[in-house]
Regions:
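Short periplasmic/luminal acceptor-recognition loop of GT-C membrane glycosyltransferases, typified by
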Residues: 352-469
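Transmembrane-helix signature of polytopic, membrane-embedded enzymes
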Residues: 91-114
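Extracytosolic helix-loop segments that constitute the early lumenal/periplasmic catalytic or substrate-binding loops
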Residues: 6-12, 26-50, 57, 64
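Transmembrane-helix motifs of polytopic, lipid-linked glycan transferases
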Residues: 78-99, 138
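Membrane-interface transmembrane helices that cradle and orient dolichyl/undecaprenyl
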Residues: 97-99, 137-153, 328
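Hydrophobic/aromatic-rich transmembrane helices and adjacent perimembrane loops
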Residues: 306-332
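Transmembrane-lumen/periplasm boundary regions of multi-pass, lipid-linked membrane glycan transferases
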Residues: 26-32, 158, 162, 166, ...
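Specific aromatic-rich, kink-prone transmembrane helix
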Residues: 90, 131-148, 320-323
Length: 470
């Protein structure tokens, strides 16, 4: 099962072009932080970035990927893929130790074929979400294990702090789940344990905040609170609108067959007058409370937030997979032959269907011709660190896609510029990106320019002759 997950996550991982939202932004932040040797302040085009208002842990993860496999799309996404694998592994281990091998296998199968978890802004992209989902999962599984040993509660608190340092206020879901879990399970902690838990949750965040404050005071925190929390929660920003049915529709779009199987299993249990857990076992009762909260809390909080984005509910896929695995294993081991046969056929059909979707996706990367043209500068001699301008006949300032900014930086440390054609002519260390519909021979001859390279998207021009590397 792990081999299926590994294939789904890593096959052709570096062959897909970089996406502008949001992996390119994170990739630029990480690249520039690494180049400048500043691991605290994220920048975009070498200016402090007050649009991407996240603490630095996800940038550090991308930096690690760059260091391990190079400045390329694979380096951008490597740690996301590893975190997705780790999420599947810790889910499998938790379920195996508490519910048996079959439940573990089925949970792995479900999560390994969850299309949104794999291909939408998570496992196969350089976004912060895969790391966040891993830390979210680690936090809640540790919370569930704390019924056996209080030390796991502190692990949960520490995982929360790392989740906050990855995706900021999104980690609030973990804190809400922790609070409700302790309330509903009747857990009572001593003052000493409360203090220890709070230290585990807050100390890493406070250390980062103090260090960040040294650079720009409260400027980052003000934007982080006002825009990334209050504004995002109360107003649909950047066109991300939706009503109360939004995330239900998202789940049906990406997870319909697994949801149908889950609903069918719940109905079977109701008709058979069975229970999912032994009510006499308080440990099992704690597990079902935690798993239900893990699904319900993020779903409700994101439903009531005004800004709706489909990948916000990624953290609920691990608990859904766990619940499906546990229920399915109980039915397959205890129910009548007909019910077991129907369930097994349904599981195999769903897994086969979603695996087919994943196979289609990973085997058909959609090329981006503009990025491919920029990548061709890798073969040019002596242009590393050049400025890159974009030509427009009406002298408008260039608008750069974030994916183009990152590709330029990764390929040749090119610095994209917003200046017009005349700014390019004044710069001795510069290249000009020209879209094919704007290109004319007169543009080249009248300005004594050279065609450096080209493809079906357009041309790259220079004022000097540039050799191809041998």
């Amino acid at each position: 099962m792990l081999s299926i997950a590994f294939y789904n996550i890593f096959y052709h991982l570096g062959k897909f072009p970089i996406y502008s939202w949001d992996e390119a932004r994170h990739g630029v932040n990480a690249y520039e932080m690494l180049r400048q040797g500043n691991f605290i302040v994220n920048t975009y085009r070498y200016k402090a970035d007050y649009w991407n208002l996240k603490p630095p842990l996800s940038y550090w993860a991308i930096m690690a990927g760059y260091k391990l496999v190079g400045f390329n799309a694979l380096g951008l996404r490597l740690i996301s893929g590893i975190c997705a694998m780790l999420t599947i592994i810790i889910v499998a281990i938790f379920v195996k130790k508490n519910f048996g091998n079959l439940a573990s296998l089925l949970s792995m199968l479900t999560l390994s074929t969850s299309t949104q978890f794999l291909i939408n802004h998570s496992a196969r992209t350089g976004d912060a979400d895969s790391l966040f989902v891993f830390l979210f999962t680690a936090a809640i599984l540790s919370l569930l294990l704390s019924v056996k040993n209080d030390k796991w509660l502190y692990v949960s608190g520490f995982a929360f702090s790392l989740a906050f340092l990855t995706k900021s206020w999104h980690a609030g879901n973990i804190a809400v789940i922790m609070g409700l879990y302790l309330l509903f399970t009747g857990r009572k902690l001593s003052y000493k344990k409360w203090i220890s838990l709070c230290l585990c949750m807050m100390a890493p965040i406070l250390i980062w905040a103090v260090i960040r404050y040294q650079y720009d005071g409260f400027a980052f925190f003000k934007n982080m609170f006002e825009y990334d929390l209050l504004h995002r929660s109360t107003v649909p920003i950047e066109g991300h609108v939706g009503d109360e049915s939004y995330y239900g529709i998202v789940l049906c779009r990406f997870y319909f067959l697994w949801l149908a199987i889950l609903l069918g299993m719940i109905l079977v249990y109701n008709f058979q007058n069975n229970v999912l857990f032994d009510k006499s076992n308080s440990e099992n009762q704690s597990y079902i409370i935690g798993l239900c909260l893990w699904v319900i809390v993020p779903f409700i909080l994101y439903t009531f937030a005004k800004t709706k984005i489909i990948w916000y509910i990624l953290p609920i896929y691990p608990p859904l997979s766990i619940i499906i695995g546990i229920l399915a294993s109980k039915i397959l081991m205890k129910e009548r032959f007909l019910i077991r046969t129907v369930l097994l056929a349904s599981i195999l059909f769903a897994a086969h269907y979603y695996e087919g979707e994943i196979q289609t996706y990973v085997n058909n990367p959609i090329p981006n011709d503009q990025l491919s043209l920029i990548e061709k500068t890798k073969a040019l001699d002596g242009v590393r660190g050049y400025s890159l301008y974009k030509y427009h006949p009406t002298r408008h300032k260039a608008v750069w896609a974030q994916s183009a900014v990152l590709t330029a930086e990764l390929v040749n440390d090119l610095k994209v510029k917003s200046g017009d054609f005349h700014a390019f002519l004044k710069n001795d260390r510069a290249l000009l990106l020209v879209k094919k519909r704007f290109f004319t021979k007169r543009l080249v001859t009248s300005n004594l320019l050279n065609i450096v390279t080209s493809n079906r998207w357009g041309y790259i021009l220079s004022k000097e002759k540039i050799r191809i590397k041998h």
